[in-house]
């Protein structure tokens, strides 16, 4: 083992892999729970809006898929003999998609809850809610793009 390829280098890649799925699932579960509470509360008085108001829950679930994609890509490239550079890049990729997915899930949950409750009283608010949800979803997409770019550089010009 050299200084560039220590025995603990795969640890950082493993943490990146775990961070990608854990943080995005935290965000997705918060978004699902928060907007799900709003859907349940408004469906009592307006059951006709139930299917229409499921959009925030679906969008929150998509956030977890971003983390799954990066986690699978990082875990596929993990190896016992790995450069420290690769481990750090994989950690950065996992944190990138994970933390942006966490923030996006929080935003989707809060906007989804308020939007669903507002739509029950004024149906014209639905379009505005969808637009804001799209902007919140894009936050997670930015993290996915950065993670994919980082992961594509993880094994370039590195040998152990």
Curated annotation (Swiss-Prot):
The chain crosses the membrane at residues 7-27, 54-74, 91-111, 130-150. The keyword DNA repair does not apply. GO terms for biological process: endocytosis; intracellular copper ion homeostasis; intracellular iron ion homeostasis; protein targeting to vacuole; vacuolar acidification; vacuole organization. Residues 28-53, 112-129 are cytoplasmic. InterPro entries: ATPase_proteolipid_c-like_dom, ATPase_proteolipid_csu, ATPase_proteolipid_su_C_euk, F/V-ATP_Csub_sf. Coiled coil: none annotated. Keywords: Hydrogen ion transport, Ion transport, Membrane, Transmembrane, Transmembrane helix, Transport, Vacuole. It comes from the Eukaryota. Proton-conducting pore forming subunit of the V0 complex of vacuolar(H+)-ATPase (V-ATPase), a multisubunit enzyme composed of a peripheral complex (V1) that hydrolyzes ATP and a membrane integral complex (V0) that translocates protons. V-ATPase is responsible for acidifying and maintaining the pH of intracellular compartments. This is V-type proton ATPase subunit c. It comes from Candida tropicalis (Yeast).
